[in-house]
Amino acid sequence: MGANPSGKEGGAPIENQRTLRIHLVLEVSIPEGTPLFQALTLAFWRFQGLAVTTLFTAVLQAIEARTRMELEARFPGRFRNKGTQPRQWQLPFGPVRLALTKLWDPVARRTVYPLKEAMELPKHVRWCEETLVPGYRLAVLQSFRQSQKAIRGLAPDGRAPSHHTVHRRFQGFAETLDPVPDYTHRPGPKPAAYQQADGTKLKLQAQGHNAGSADLRLVVGSRTPHGPLEVLDYSVGDSWDEISQRLRQRFPKPPKVLISDGEEGIPEALAGPETLHQRCLVHGRRNLPFALYQDGYPKADRDRIEQAFGRIPGLQLCQAELARVDPTDKPAIRELLEASEQAFLALKRRLPAADFPHTRRYVLGLIEDGLAYLRHLLATGQTIPLSTNRLESIWSRVLLRLKQIGRRWSAPGALNMLAACLVYALHPQRYAEAEAALRGEHLPQVSVLITSLETVWAS
């Protein structure tokens, strides 16, 4: 262990493998007249935390003593004893308390901690990440209070941090998660040719007070029309124009096809000159009653409009029915497109602009964007998704946590939780790797073995 008062924690790493032997004497007192197996099980279950924390403390003290000896041997007479500094860490196997030895270095005019010269110790925290990691997953799936209970259930002594501490520490973990993969060095086509975009509202708070609501927005894409979806961009409070700028930096080429629910601003920001914009047909059918309601027509007065809308054949297809359409049968596709356009024109004549301003604008938008899939099929022979259902499926796994369990968020907290939920839902392997990295499983492993075991009955 090459000790050197460098001023940096871990400045004296273990240069080669060394073995520390701990001679442990364990005394087991067995009372008479007790169910022995059950009593032993309970005793060792209670003892496990004490045993491991005692051994862990002994190892730290041994490393500290050796490092101090090496420092004093390398720099004779340089250091003066300055007492100790108490430290405490809550680890997965229980609490560890240690008095860190302090040495005064008059040459460098600073305090030297031998143990910090040998290893990097957790700074300014009592609850170590290794203890909190099992609770982070429950924070994503359920809530921070459930996360706190999970940590308490795993701790040998039943201790747990407050849910406020879990929330605060979770932010650092979530900041390491990015649901947008790095495509910089990936060969082949990027998953931005076929994009889907959607947004929703999220309530925010600032310093405990209502801060209104912000737009929660998500853009996903795939390499083929029906290929696996990957996150291209996610945001809280950003406009579609800001999202478009980030997408153009990652993917300079505009998408071939863009599918949205018709939210204002999506096609203007995300679509390029050659992009085909397809309106989600599920939202198209669902949003007509709201447009009529905006024009002041209650349910009893809008049946004739809804019936005429239902006679547009191109808006009634589902994805399975479209898959059964023969792409080589151009006359049949052209007939379906023309019939749909004629039905749209008939509906348009029933909607004078003076009486139906919102509904007329809504229907005119659907004539172009709602039937885009038929024009694309006629021109290329290729089917595209008719709805944002696959994107809505991703939303369903995220919004339960963000809008039902958690009701109010700060903007950074909402963004961190959105990232964690997306990574957990779409890339579980990457989430598991992030947990493993937090536990240090990527580092060279220390081997702990019981090399000999001998039992002796006391006389």
Map each language-model feature to its residues.
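Inter-helix linker motif
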Residues: 273-297
